[in-house]
């Protein structure tokens, strides 16, 4: 698919407020021990962080295990790391080698005892993928709210 067509698909954007300080919310995204308990679309899944090199250019790899036995593996490269304000990384599903790489940006706004998170997932290849990822991120952010 041409780059012009990819950019025509609107990004997934979500803004949520979490009852946790910004540093704690940022750590939940950047520490493997804190990421694993919540990073899945629902309680039907468990997560194993197999790699997390939190440096610009560093790689991450996350396995999301469904109770029914399916395993989904997502991986990518960190592009921006600005603790505790911003995190940006590429996103690619291993089980779909034809899938194009997309980009996730997470911004953390300090609200004192709370944190506003703005999540943007862009360069998704189709409206269908945008919808699937939107539902997935809704679930992940709900899990994060329970975790924090």
Predicted regions mapped to residue ranges:
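Short beta-edge strand/loop motif at the mouth of beta-sheet-based domains
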Residues: 13-14, 33-71
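Beta-strand/loop substructures that line and gate deep hydrophobic ligand-binding cavities in soluble
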Residues: 88-138
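Short amphipathic alpha-helical signal-transduction/dimerization elements
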Residues: 30, 141-148
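A short, structured loop/turn motif at beta-sheet edges
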Residues: 22-23, 54-55, 79-85, 107-116
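Hydrophobic pocket/interface hotspot
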Residues: 25, 35, 60, 78, ...
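Hydrophobic ligand-binding cavity/cleft-lining segments
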Residues: 1-46
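Hydrophobic/aromatic beta-strand elements that line small-molecule binding cavities or substrate pockets
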Residues: 16, 50, 74-80, 91, ...
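Intrinsic-disorder/low-complexity, polar/charged segments enriched in Ser/Thr/Lys/Arg/Asp/Glu/Gln
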Residues: 9-15, 22, 47, 59, ...
């Amino acid at each position: 698919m041409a780059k012009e067509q990819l950019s025509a698909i609107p990004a997934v954007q979500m803004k949520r407020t979490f009852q946790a300080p910004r540093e704690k919310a940022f750590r939940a995204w950047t520490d493997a021990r804190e990421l694993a308990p919540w990073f899945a679309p629902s309680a039907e899944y468990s997560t194993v962080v197999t790699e997390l090199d939190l440096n610009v250019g560093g790689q991450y790899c996350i396995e999301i295990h469904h109770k029914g036995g399916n395993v989904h593996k997502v991986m990518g490269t960190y592009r921006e790391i600005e603790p505790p304000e911003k995190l940006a990384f590429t996103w690619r599903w291993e089980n779909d080698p034809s899938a194009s790489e997309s980009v996730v940006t997470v911004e953390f706004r300090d609200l004192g005892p709370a944190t506003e998170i703005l999540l943007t997932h862009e360069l998704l290849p189709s409206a269908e993928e945008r919808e699937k990822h939107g539902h997935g991120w809704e679930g992940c952010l709900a899990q994060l709210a329970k975790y924090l």
